[in-house]
Amino acid sequence: MIESLRQPASLMPGRLELPPPPVARPFDVVVTPPGSKSLTNRVLLLAALASGTSQIKGPLVDADDAQRMIHALRVLGAAFEQAPGGELLVTGVNGNWRVPAGGVTLDLNNAGTATRFLAAAALLSDGPVTIDGNGRMRERPIGELGAALSSLGATIRYAGLPGCPPMTVIPPADRAAIGNDVAFPTTQSSQFISALALVAPWLDRGLTMRLEGDVTSASYITMTIRLLENLGVGVRTSADERVIRIPGRAVGTGPPRAFDLVIEPDASGATYFWAAAAMVPGACARVEGLGPDSLQGDAEFPELLAT
């Protein structure tokens, strides 16, 4: 059961077999899980790239992944401040990382999401950016994303195992030389696609991504696209969702500017409360901050329980 709950809702079986309930009496609870880690990482990067100061409410900043992301974004030039009310204020770089000519190294330890997102974001640097991590991260393949960045004009170098961190990304000297079309013959991680999608609005010509193989964890790509749309980016997708077109700096209103945003509670964590209520007749578990417009695929979990 626990392993099932860790999967995106779209991968859940049509009918769930629930074990006997540990609680025999009905209950009625209202819960608010911590902010979504997936949304936090996406919003941190977008706010750091935007122009002006964004206000983020409810981010999961205590998680090690988020701390690594924030530290790396500071190195790249973004500024972070904790407001008295608990909001996180992020002053972005308007799509231009402040990297010295000699480059920088970002040690992301074991933060996989930050590793993938910042590898793609290195396209927006004026100098080399080396993505590194701990021993375990140095064994995790990132070559598929490296190949995509190479096809867009970046020079990619690996200092250790082929296709694994440490990976140095050297963007083209001329930002206008960055390509605007990339194909993924296979998709080892949906985060590779999300990483490029998050960066695309700041590319001069935007980006078209063609997904040719099986797509893993597609609900997280949908999350990224909907988040961009909520911030005013005119993303277009084909009917089969295999082609994703994201406009660049010179199109429409341009990339996102400073924004105010509330991070949704983590829907994956909420599934435990919903499942517990489903096992006890007459019980009710309500999750504040999650509704029908949630960006998270796991927010559909109650609908699966009702089938």
What are these model-derived regions, one by one?
Residues 1-307:
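Structural preference for solvent-exposed beta-strand-turn elements
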